[in-house]
């Protein structure tokens, strides 16, 4: 599983860099909105908007900052990258469906938002799939070696 570990570590590194980079860029470009949340007391700083009030440019920008940051998939992508790294270190195979799902999500995102780093996420998904396939092959080879019939 050494090659599989290497593939999974590369995949997890890509996921962590994509998620952290996304949050870092948001912090750089929307710092005033983020500090505004703290100034307003954080609780319900981004209202759900179920009222009859008309949406202003400022409230739309506030909501966009939320959905581009903590409400985006950046945090779950970082967590998935950390989990993948942890599982690779322990020698536990990550299922191929995780890689296929990540790759499909990133292809759709990349097609909808061009140019974007979504396609790097497709590479991470492909690496997870390759690692799972290598793990399946090595398990089959071990079974054949144990069954001399």
Where does each model-flagged region fall?
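Juxtamembrane membrane-interface segments at transmembrane alpha-helix termini
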Residues: 24-27, 51, 108-114, 131-142
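Short, intrinsically disordered terminal tails adjacent to the first/last structured region
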Residues: 1, 139-149
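Hydrophobic alpha-helical transmembrane segments of integral membrane proteins
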Residues: 91-129
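N-terminal signal-anchor transmembrane alpha helix
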Residues: 8-35
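Mid-chain, well-packed structural core segment of small domains
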Residues: 64-98
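Juxtamembrane non-transmembrane "cap" segments at the membrane-aqueous interface
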Residues: 33-45
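Membrane-water interface of alpha-helical transmembrane segments
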Residues: 2-12, 60-63, 67, 92-99
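Juxtamembrane membrane-water interface segments that cap and precede transmembrane helices
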Residues: 47-65
């Amino acid at each position: 599983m050494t090659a599989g570990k290497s593939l999974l570590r590369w995949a997890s590194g890509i996921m962590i860099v994509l998620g952290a980079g996304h949050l870092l860029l948001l912090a750089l470009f929307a710092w005033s909105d983020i500090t505004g949340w703290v100034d307003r007391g954080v609780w319900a700083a981004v209202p759900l908007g179920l009222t009859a009030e008309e949406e202003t440019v400022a409230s739309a920008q506030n909501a966009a900052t939320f959905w581009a940051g903590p409400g985006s998939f950046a945090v779950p992508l970082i967590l998935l990258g950390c989990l993948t790294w942890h599982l690779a270190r322990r020698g536990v195979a990550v299922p191929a469906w995780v890689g296929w799902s990540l790759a499909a999500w990133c292809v759709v995102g990349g097609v909808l938002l061009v140019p974007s780093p979504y396609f790097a996420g497709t590479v991470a998904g492909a690496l997870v799939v390759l690692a799972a396939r290598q793990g399946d092959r090595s398990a089959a080879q071990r079974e054949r070696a144990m069954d001399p019939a």
